[in-house]
Amino acid sequence: MSASSDAEMAVFGEAAPFLRKSEKERIEAQNKPFDAKTSVFVAEPKASYVKSTIQSKEGGKVTVKTEGGATLTVREDQVFPMNPPKYDKIEDMAMMTHLHEPGVLYNLKERYAAWMIYTYSGLFCVTVNPYKWLPVYNPEVVAAYRGKKRQEAPPHIFSISDNAYQFMLTDRENQSILITGESGAGKTVNTKRVIQYFATIAVTGEKKKEEATSGKMQGTLEDQIISANPLLEAFGNAKTVRNDNSSRFGKFIRIHFGTTGKLASADIETYLLEKSRVTFQLKAERSYHIFYQITSNKKPDLIEMLLITTNPYDYAFVSQGEITVPSIDDQEELMATDSAIDILGFTPEEKVSIYKLTGAVMHYGNMKFKQKQREEQAEPDGTEVADKAAYLQNLNSADLLKALCYPRVKVGNEYVTKGQTVQQVYNAVGALAKAVYEKMFLWMVTRINQQLDTKQPRQYFIGVLDIAGFEIFDFNSLEQLCINFTNEKLQQFFNHHMFVLEQEEYKKEGIEWTFIDFGMDLAACIELIEKPLGIFSILEEECMFPKATDTSFKNKLYDQHLGKSANFQKPKVVKGKAEAHFSLIHYAGTVDYNIGGWLDKNKDPLNDTVVGLYQKSAMKTLASLFSTYASAEADSGAKKGAKKKGSSFQTVSALFRENLNKLMTNLRSTHPHFVRCIIPNETKTPGAMEHELVLHQLRCNGVLEGIRICRKGFPSRILYGDFKQRYKVLNASAIPEGQFIDSKKASEKLLASIDIDHTQYKFGHTKVFFKAGLLGLLEEMRDEKLSQIITRTQAVCRGFLMRVEYQKMLQRREALFCIQYNIRAFMNVKHWPWMRLFFKIKPLLKSAETEKEMATMKEEFQKTKDELAKSEAKRKELEEKMVTLLKEKNDLQLQVQSEADALADAEERCEQLIKNKIQLEAKIKEVTERAEDEEEINAELTAKKRKLEDECSELKKDIDDLELTLAKVEKEKHATENKVKNLTEEMAGLDETIAKLTKEKKALQEAHQQTLDDLQAEEDKVNTLTKAKTKLEQQVDDLEGSLEQERKLRMDLERAKRKLEGDLKLAQESTMDAENDKQQLDEKLKKKEFEISNLLSKIEDEQAIEIQLQKKIKELQARIEELEEEIEAERASRAKAEKQRSDLSRELEEISERLEEAGGATSAQIEMNKKREAEFQKMRRDLEEATLQHEATAATLRKKHADSVAELGEQIDNLQRVKQKLEKEKSEMKMEIDDLASNAETISKAKGNLEKMCRTLEDQVSELKTKEEEQQRLINDLTAQRARLQTEAGEYSRQLDEKDALVSQLSRSKQASTQQIEELKRQLEEETKAKNALAHALQSSRHDCDLLREQYEEEQEGKAELQRALSKANSEVAQWRTKYETDAIQRTEELEEAKKKLAQRLQEAEEHVEAVNAKCASLEKTKQRLQNEVEDLMLDVERSNAACAALDKKQRNFDKVLAEWKQKYEETQAELEASQKEARTLSTELFKVKNAYEESLDQVETLKRENKNLQQEISDLTEQIAEGGKQIHELEKIKKQVEQEKCDIQAALEEAEASLEHEEGKILRIQLELNQVKSEVDRKIAEKDEEIDQLKRNHIRVMESMQSTLDAEIRSRNDALRVKKKMEGDLNEMEIQLNHANRLAAESLRNYRNTQGILKDTQLHLDDALRGQEDLKEQLAMVERRANLLQAEIEELRATLEQTERSRKTAEQELLDASERVQLLHTQNTSLINTKKKLENDVSQLQSEVEEVIQESRNAEEKAKKAITDAAMMAEELKKEQDTSAHLERMKKNMEQTVKDLQHRLDEAEQLALKGGKKQIQKLEARVHELEGEVESEQKRNAEAVKGLRKHERRVKELTYQTEEDRKNVLRLQDLVDKLQAKVKSYKRQAEEAEEQSNTNLAKFRKLQHELEEAEERADIAESQVNKLRVKSREVHTKISAE
């Protein structure tokens, strides 16, 4: 895949970063450090594979260190090499250096993490479901993929679609796109995108035409194709466990195209709608979307029309599972469905019928029935629901209920009424609901197809298959079996097609290759289902038996397959899971199936009485749905005498298999394109990938089999031209220069000259093929070679430059010597009298001549100036023409290339046509011969024709008789009706004989019904006979037409007959030979039978041994299970012992600590300590003994288990080898038996055939007749093919004529171009460099244009220099003339020097003109060469006239590209103007800073009020800190990104500083604003001082209050101890947080100082820029005085201005992006600062509580004085901290002075401070640890005076486990609190400094403060916010790299 530049990817718009890596990312990947020897993937149970680094290798074992830091030792076969970084996120996984499972998995994972969801894997495309919307299907993406080859664009479903479209047009072959995968993988979405693509690209210019021709359509064809999806999804899609929008039916959409590639029509075939979902759903699923759309109340008129409510729970059929789906808006979907119905042209009546039938199905589920008293008969339980359902279906409610409860059943020839139980009625209602819904769905598909059939001419189609994915549910029924079977068939088709194509590629290229069949892996499961005696066969057989049940079906399955087929298993019983009856091992996993109700589902019976009501319904739609329905009873009665095997009505499984076979036939007739959809995880989480799940799908989908072929074959392949161009640098001497050499031969020579294994590559016809990994080796060799070449080139260039410099130094030295010599000589003679006289007189002598020379020089100067102006004008004109010629040359090159490609294609097709022609001629010859043989049968055919004529006449007579019979029957019918009326009248009058009359009436009615049936049968016969008559007449006509031809064939047939007679004699002779052979074979057969009997006995013995071994295996397996259970029990006991040991250890540690802390207090405590210590030692010994015992037991069990496993493994291996050997021998014996049997059968057949050869001549005649018919069909096919070939030949002729015309046109264009080239020969200054650009594309052309522009500017500068020199000379001449006139004698020397200078300048000007002319001459030669090249190109064009149509297409595409680039140029100009406007708007941004500052003042007041409530948030803060840890982890990731952005922004700032020349006024305003900031900061400092004083006073009051309550606290000592435990834990956490915040503030100060240094440097750059501005102003004034140089100077300044504006625009955009990131980071900084403030209050509270305990201890203990001493020491430390704080205050004031000057850089400084967030946190944590160490050391020094203080300090840290308080602990608390008091004061001062720095951002703090208050509510949203930040960061990177 060629990597596109960011500029080329710009056409994809916002989708670019989701399709391909940016240039920056690709460069970073190539430069990323990588060690190919140690970087590997390692197999790991949890994550499947992990990235690791090899540490060591020893004895087949490898020790590695994983990414997570773990060290593993694995086998060498579990280690897989990692691909180099340049293959990261590769678009085609077949191109990877190392092909294996982990490489594919991690490539997909990394691309999925970057939201690149499409990836090629060789010949097909893999897509991973993103579970979120991505902007990769926008219209600009469709346009970008149109017409692109696969390798020209990133992987995408649009690329697959466009390739299929292009293949259809070029190969003239039907295409199909198979989108397969498991349920929930995204197949339906990709199907929509395919249809969207075709509907977009294939309708240009056709919409009006379609609208005109459609007439009745409500929308255009493309709209209708697109609208078919929403309608089908509403009625055919539902929520399942794995997919919210799962297609519950399969569809094959065929999109037909006309001859020009435009949309012609479309049709849809559907498969296996899951109609059971209408009445039943699982808990986590729901029914079809349409039910919930209707009840969404988006269209209230529907609710009223359908007589339903808006609550789905009111309807039993649709509320068994869930009723809402979060990802689907039912209201919007209803509008889309309703709109689709209108667009697809359904009539209003049909639309209403669809809704009414859907509502009726919902009402069906609510119909209630009950059992009659004392009977099993069911009766309606209310008629309200039935009335609604009947109303919606235009039925009579009473008739409907009667038909349900009392259906009429046909028994023999009579109909009787049958009673129904309640359950039977409910079953019938459910069946009717499913039938109505299914038939309505199929009717809608038929109507859609009618609407999409536009009757336009169509040639080829592209089919898109979207069928339900593989399903494994908790409850799997017949529907799931059918779906999974379909996927098995598709997977087998996929395997066969894809892998055969890959291997045929090798054969096509002429590479030796042994074919590997990968398509039979799934045959076992497929045969188990569909072959005779398979599951479907047994199911249909059971449906034939009236008394068959599910149990009998299951028993037959078990008898037939259980234990005989490896894919058929008995499921395991799992509690809580649905019952399963058998399991099948599919390619995607094992599925448990429940066969309940399969027989009924397969027969699909309906209540015929209700169906009859449907057929008579006034609703036309309902009546038409069931118009063709035939009852099972009628069919079964009719079939008894006709068929033996099955009924005439089709079962569901038979119909399914028929449709599936049709589908597979369709697919095999097309060229398929495969898209494999992958589910990344089971939880539908965007961005998450489960390794095992993905690997399972990759194995099932054939991805890894494809890689297996790549590993065996040659996955890397390069065209010879590309290989020569790229790798020629490896050995340039291998390819001779200056002579033509074929690319293939050059590649062969090049590879032969390189030291690589020759078996690792193969040469094909057009490509060179490489084994996996070799291409990576070649790339490394190429990189090394390029490095050497570049180093050598640099050395040569440096040497050349130094030599040039040395020559210049020598020339200057010689010039100095010459000048010095002449000056010395002149100084010696200038005072001579004669010389003075000479100086005075000589000018007078030549004054007149000088004037003439001056005049002449002026004229020459003027002429030179005019010529220069003309030259400039011509040069501009030539430059314009040159650009045109360059474009034309590029166009011609593209045309030549495209025509060459087209010519190659045409030649290939021509060769294929010639081959086909030869084959067809051979076939024609063969057919002709056969046709001659068929003439012999002509007489018989003539006789048959006469016989058929007689039969026709007889049939006509029969038809006449039938018509008479029909009339007679009609009369009898009328007579019968009259008789019935008479009988009815007699019945009214004769009550006495009513019984007899009733019987007679019944008999008459039956006779009447029989008559009607007979009449219907006769009518059917009449219709059949009419059709037969028509068919026979057509056959007669055909026979008459072929009569003449067969007469001609008769003679040849007679000759063939004679030939057959000769063959008969030969056959009789061979019969005798066969008899002899038979006798020999009989003898051999007897021997073989004897051997077979021996082998069979041997096999039986081995089978007995095998059975014994299997029993032994089972026993060993049971023993293994017992051992495993023992191991598990031992593990459990060991875990329990470990837990007891840990508990004992913890208790012992607590006891020891208490003993140590209480040691020395009293003698009782000492004794208790000794006892507890003894107990502790005893417990420890017991624990160690128990541990050793457990370890020994576990080791013994492990050893036993390992030995058992090894022994079993050896036995199993031996058994497997024996079994394989026996199976092999068995198969060989079977083959021999089959061969012998076949030979015997062949001999017997040959004997019988030879004996009856004479009698078989008649059979041969009949066979010849069949052959004649076949030949006739072949002749017709050949005739059609010949016509098609003639049409194609005519088309080719027309194309040749068009190309001839185009060639002549191009010749004329060539002549015109030649004339233009001759006119432009004189002054093409830049043609030399443009020559090189002709070999490159538009990128190189731009580069050449830049070079031309630079040279043009150099010429302009030279011209300006000449003009300045001439003007200066003119001024000097005028001065000299004036001086000469006043004092000619005295100024002779000066005039002479002026003359010399003037002459020298004129000479320089002439030399420059000559140089220009020389360049023009050089360019004339170059132009001549260009002309020759153009002529060569024109010759190439003439040779490529066979593909001119493709040339026109390429030309139009290139014109589009040029137009796009022109548009981009215009856009660039517009952006330049816009940037000038943006420069004026910069001043407004400065006011934003001021507004932000004012908002910060308001925030200060808000924060003051909020600080009063912080006391109540301590408990919340503890939880928030834990959550903050997670956020810090995310911040660390963000920090890395921000650091990278900081570097980019810093570089951009350096560029942007040049654009600040015009910002002096802004700087002044900023200084004024900073003065205001300073005053505000001073005021805030004063306010903070007041707050600190207030806090001190509050603390004093609290201390006094604590002293007064000391006695009360002594009584509540135990309670205080418990409180203190919690407080101490909180105190430690708060101290850490305070230290963290304090260090963050200190680090911010340090970073701020660094930033000040940077800003000072920036100020210096600004000063330099200002000085540069003054210089520019002076230069501008000089330019204005020089009118003749004005234009050149203006152009220079304009170019400078444009560059400056672009830099400023880039910098401003980057500054805006950076400010957004700064805002985000400010919020995080705010979190830390606010936390710090809360912690200050928390510490003060904790301090007050701790001081209460301290006061109590001071009065109770004698050693409180030592704690006071320690407090004094801490006071000294406090003083030191105060001094430090004062020093920091002075530094702060100095910094504020600097801030005043550079306020507008404050955001960047804060960003720099915040970007080091993680490092600051680490430093702060380190500092916290240092301070804790200092505290501990200080406590140790204090412990010298107080024994045991150190133990008490440790005890304070573990207060949670302490139950008693003693005096030593109080002393330690006193010390700790004193230190905390000092620290708090220091922290407050430092917090003030941090707050002063952050006060400009306080307005931004409000947002995060609010987030902290609602932390618990936002916990679930935190991760999504981090993801958004990542996406935003990527967009910023993308924008920066793009700009």
Swiss-Prot record:
The modification Phosphotyrosine is found at Y391, Y426, Y1465, Y1493. Muscle contraction. ATP binds at G181, E182, S183, G184, A185, G186, K187, T188. Gene3D superfamilies: 1.10.10.820, 1.20.5.340, 1.20.5.370, 1.20.5.4820, 1.20.58.530, 6.10.250.2420, Kinesin motor domain, Myosin S1 fragment, N-terminal. Residues 783-815 form the IQ domain. It comes from Canis lupus familiaris (Dog). Residues 35-84 form the Myosin N-terminal SH3-like domain. GO terms for molecular function: actin filament binding; ATP binding; calmodulin binding; microfilament motor activity. The modification N6,N6,N6-trimethyllysine is found at K132. This is Myosin-8. GO terms for biological process: muscle contraction.
